[in-house]
Regions:
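Nucleotide/phosphate-binding catalytic cleft detector across ATP-hydrolyzing
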Residues: 1-190, 209-221, 245-295, 301-338
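Long, charge-rich alpha-helical interaction segments
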Residues: 226, 230-234
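Contiguous hydrophobic, core-forming segments of folded domains
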Residues: 190, 197-200
Length: 338
């Protein structure tokens, strides 16, 4: 019996890893997406049996070495920073561990949908615009070699590398099942601002062509984290990633059991970042933004600055789930390759 081919899109972000899984039979999968923090720590033995059992789901082995990833790595390692805050992190064992963990989570999604025996896969990963050309082939080869080691002999895998900034546009050009929508084609112009943790990526597609000169990168939402971390340290508060992430969401932290309002520290950091991004949008797109059919603002940072960009650009669009726009775009592209 012919088994349904599978598309897996993995956005290995610098603050969280997002996974989107789709089947070529155009039937939506239950629980088709998942997300976990971009944190990796060397494995250590956990003495508490219940904690150790829970940690198994966040434990991976790469080249004979075991790692904790995600929430377990965050808690057991008391992480103050996300992993992979460097340009060449695709060459690190931390990146390898996150990719393997994401692949395993994708397989769990398939198993939950009674598709655990799938044997044909398209895996789509991505890179920031500024070093897409340089790292595309090294990443493809590394990912293929890594995942080939853990799949079955009868399973077929192809790996594709996309530009992060192009991925949200794929969500406009194709629907959730990989069918063309009629948008973003030869008669339309679109811009994308993809605000990740490490970089913010820009791209401009003009009447069916990606304009190379417009594909570029600026700093990402780590600027917000860095400023808040400095403020928290000066005030004597914890400045780990978990504390800062929750503070951005709620404007509050807990200190010695007491809930403290830190909005006066968080808001200036976000407003400074918003001003920076809007300046970058104006510089990189200029008057071209006026003739765009749409300006997509995606990525995790869209939650912080999306409304400000929309206030200045009436054609700006923030996807329903901007954090997953890249992984979703990857998985839609993967359907086209099956």
């Amino acid at each position: 019996m012919q088994k349904t081919p599978i598309s897996i899109g993995i956005d290995l972000g610098h603050s969280s890893v997002k996974v989107s899984v789709k089947s070529a039979n155009k039937i939506a999968l239950n629980g088709a997406t998942t997300i976990f923090p971009t944190v990796v720590r060397n494995w250590t033995k956990i003495s508490n049996e219940e904690t150790a059992r829970k940690a198994l789901a966040d434990t991976v082995e790469v080249n004979g070495k075991k790692f904790f990833v995600g929430v377990t790595a965050q808690l057991q390692g008391q992480a103050e920073n996300f992993s992979g805050q460097s340009r060449n992190w695709i060459e690190t064992e931390q990146h390898d561990a996150l990719l393997v963990a994401a692949w395993i989570r994708a397989q769990r999604i398939l198993a939950q949908n009674d598709m655990g025996d799938a044997n044909t896969f398209s895996l789509v990963l991505g890179l920031p615009a500024s070093y897409y050309d340089e790292q595309r082939e090294p990443l493809r080869k590394r990912a293929l070699a890594l995942i080939t080691k853990i799949i079955q002999p009868d399973q077929k895998l192809r790996v594709f590398i996309e530009s992060q900034s192009r991925a949200p546009l794929l969500c406009v050009a194709f629907d959730a099942y990989g069918s063309e929508t009629g948008r973003a084609g030869d008669s339309e112009s679109w811009g994308v601002v993809e605000i990740g943790h490490y970089t913010t990526d820009f791209t401009f597609h003009d009447r069916g062509q990606e304009v190379d000169g417009a594909a570029s990168s600026a700093s990402g939402a780590h600027l917000v984290y860095d400023r808040i971390a400095a403020s928290f340290k000066a005030a004597g508060y914890l400045s780990d990633t978990d504390t800062i992430t929750n503070a951005i969401k709620t404007r509050k932290i807990k200190s010695f059991g007491q809930e403290i309002d830190v909005g006066h520290m968080v808001e200036p950091a976000i407003q400074e970042f918003s001003s920076y991004i809007q300046e970058e949008v104006a510089t990189r797109f200029g008057e071209k933004a006026q003739r765009m059919d749409g300006l997509i603002v995606a990525g995790g940072g869209a939650y912080m600055v999306g409304s400000d960009i929309k206030a200045n650009y009436p054609n700006a669009i923030v996807p329903t789930n901007p954090r997953f726009a890249v992984a979703e775009g990857y998985s839609r592209f993967g359907l086209l390759t099956l």
